[in-house]
């Protein structure tokens, strides 16, 4: 891989997963980057040797996917990567109120994400799905109330948590297409985000990876088409 010193490298599985918000933020900020995508093998073994063979050779403090390499800076943990990029572009909140809202959303949306991930990777998906869908409106209502009349989740300025939140709400919308219908401000947020020029252009490009959401051992979202 021939890289200039200014080109970041994002490493992750060849899926959407935890890298979707990172990819969108890199695109939105016009960051020069290249991807190293690792492929998981097919059932029943789901061979992960493409990643495991190099996992401990990359000089990462906590070897994991995703990782971001930017010169001497080598970062793991998806939210740490997002914050690293966002700090360069003043997208972590400016006022104390904005920073508090960013901190809350960063963690709340991860909790929400993990609920769907656990469901999608569970062999009991069909058994557990009704319970997930039953509690989904209550969770979405909380996000709707938190957003209120703001344009973005920190207030009137776009921050990195909007990229996270768009991703997780979109996954839930793919899982249950009508789930946002009761929440006009969440639907408006989704449209507003998709209308950002650089995001819209990215979504129309061949770089955009909407599916698969999850890796091959998942029970849902493991294919390249819905």
Task: Give the positions of each predicted feature.
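Short, solvent-exposed turn/loop segments enriched in Gly/Ser/Thr/Pro and often Arg
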Residues: 13, 160, 206
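GST-like domain detector, emphasizing the conserved glutathione-binding G-site
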Residues: 1-140, 144, 151, 220-221
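Short amphipathic alpha-helical segments embedded in low-complexity Lys/Glu-rich regions
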Residues: 41-43, 120-122, 185, 206-211
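Residue-level recognition of oxygen-bearing side chains
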Residues: 80, 185, 198
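C-terminal helix/juxtamembrane-tail motif
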Residues: 1-3, 7, 199-226
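GST superfamily/GST-like fold recognition
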Residues: 102, 153-182, 187-195, 203
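Hydrophobic/aromatic-lined pockets within catalytic cores
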Residues: 86, 90, 110, 148, ...
């Amino acid at each position: 891989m021939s890289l200039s010193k200014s080109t970041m490298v994002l490493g992750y599985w060849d899926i959407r997963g935890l890298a979707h918000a990172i990819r969108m933020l890199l695109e939105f900020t016009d960051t020069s980057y290249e991807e190293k995508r690792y492929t998981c093998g097919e059932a029943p073994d789901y061979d992960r040797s493409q990643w495991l063979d190099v996992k401990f050779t990359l000089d990462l403090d906590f070897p994991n996917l995703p990782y971001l390499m930017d010169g001497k800076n080598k970062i793991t943990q998806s939210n740490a990567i997002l914050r690293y990029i966002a700090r360069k572009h003043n997208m972590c909140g400016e006022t104390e109120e904005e920073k508090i809202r960013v901190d809350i959303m960063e963690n709340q949306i991860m909790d929400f994400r993990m609920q769907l991930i656990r469901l999608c990777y569970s062999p009991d998906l069909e058994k557990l799905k009704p319970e997930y869908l039953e509690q989904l409106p209550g969770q979405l209502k909380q996000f709707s109330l938190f957003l209120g009349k703001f344009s973005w989740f920190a207030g009137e300025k776009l921050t990195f948590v909007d990229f996270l939140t768009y991703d997780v709400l979109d996954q839930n919308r793919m899982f249950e297409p009508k789930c946002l219908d009761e929440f006009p401000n969440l639907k408006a947020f989704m449209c507003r985000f998709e209308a950002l020029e650089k995001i819209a252009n990215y979504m129309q490009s061949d770089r955009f990876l909407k599916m698969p959401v999850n890796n091959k051992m998942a029970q849902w979202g493991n294919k390249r088409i819905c």
